[in-house]
């Protein structure tokens, strides 16, 4: 899968390296199967020390773009499932010896990814790159399938060799697990090399990039921004919350719409595109997505898990209700 997906890597802002790396260099023709067994596992390790506000802003602005790019990938006609995990490090509010904190296990819940990203805050601290890579390798449930694409992206601006865990050992362990460690230095390219960020990538067969983390992303407004955002809001009305998760997750969906809109209308547009893609699946709380994943789901659904307005309906009536929502 890697030989199909990996392409020339160039960067100018955070997430551009990731977007370029998940773009397919070749697409395999064939019938598209959205129920793929292939995975893209992507872990992002954020330096949240006090100088990294610009880095987080760039990440918030580009999240939905990388999701949309990964949704265009095909492997033998299959659409790989995107799983994202997240850590932050180098922050004094992290109360452990190595200043490393897991924010998110691997998940395909993109609203949850967005919520965690927008909740990150910066504060001064010590940045231990080897330690955060080591934790990500040990604590996450990595795929054992060699055909899956597994990548770590670590971003920061302090020497890569700091801390109690030797980065060369952590990166060698990643290489043994067939995981690429890609490093993003927030500063001058040559300074990043002097501070071992290039070596950190090379020892795991990954790639080294540098960015200006304070650079503002320029978005070009289009005449369709308002219309697309209106459609995004209409999409929300087709979601039918069920079980104990439903109400809270539907509220989260609206909050992440708002977060994207606050960044820029173009960011909201990219999120709207995500919401009509196969990557945006919410079967854990949405009746319609659950049915799309398993057409027998309605027959097994417990009545107490239904929303109030649907509790008295038969399985056949629920089927008709879902069919209407699908057409919307």
Predicted segments with their positions:
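Residues in flexible loops and secondary-structure boundaries
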Residues: 9-12, 60, 125, 219, ...
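Divalent cation-coordinating acidic motifs and surrounding scaffolds
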Residues: 19-215, 223-225, 293-303, 309-311, ...
């Amino acid at each position: 899968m890697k030989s199909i997906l990996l392409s020339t890597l160039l960067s100018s802002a955070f997430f551009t390296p990731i977007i370029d790396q998940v773009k397919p260099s070749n697409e395999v023709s064939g019938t598209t199967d959205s129920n793929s067994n292939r995975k893209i596992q992507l872990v992002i390790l954020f330096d949240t020390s006090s100088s990294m506000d610009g880095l987080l802003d760039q990440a918030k602005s580009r999240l939905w773009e990388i999701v949309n790019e990964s949704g265009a990938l095909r492997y033998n006609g299959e659409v790989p499932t995107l799983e994202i995990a997240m850590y932050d490090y180098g922050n004094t509010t992290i109360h452990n010896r190595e200043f490393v904190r897991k924010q998110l296990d691997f998940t395909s819940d993109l609203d949850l990814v967005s919520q965690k990203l927008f909740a990150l805050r910066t504060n001064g601290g010590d940045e231990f790159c080897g330690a955060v890579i080591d934790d990500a390798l040990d604590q996450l449930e990595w795929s054992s399938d060699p055909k899956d694409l597994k990548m770590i992206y670590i971003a920061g601006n302090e020497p890569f060799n700091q801390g109690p865990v030797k980065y060369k050992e952590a990166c060698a362990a990643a290489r043994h697990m067939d995981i690429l460690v890609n490093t993003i230095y927030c500063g001058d390219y040559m300074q990043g090399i002097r501070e071992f960020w290039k070596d950190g990538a090379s020892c795991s067969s990954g790639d080294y990039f540098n960015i200006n983390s304070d650079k503002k992303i320029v978005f070009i407004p289009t005449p369709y921004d308002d219309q697309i955002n209106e459609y995004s809001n209409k999409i929300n009305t087709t979601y039918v919350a069920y079980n104990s998760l439903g109400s809270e997750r539907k509220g989260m969906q609206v909050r992440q719409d708002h977060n994207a809109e606050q960044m820029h209308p173009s960011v909201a547009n990219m999120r709207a595109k995500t919401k009509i893609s196969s990557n945006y699946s919410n079967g854990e709380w949405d009746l319609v997505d659950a049915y799309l994943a398993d057409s027998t789901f309605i027959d097994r659904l417990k009545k107490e898990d239904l929303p109030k307005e649907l509790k008295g309906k038969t399985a056949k009536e629920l089927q008709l209700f879902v069919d209407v929502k699908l057409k919307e």
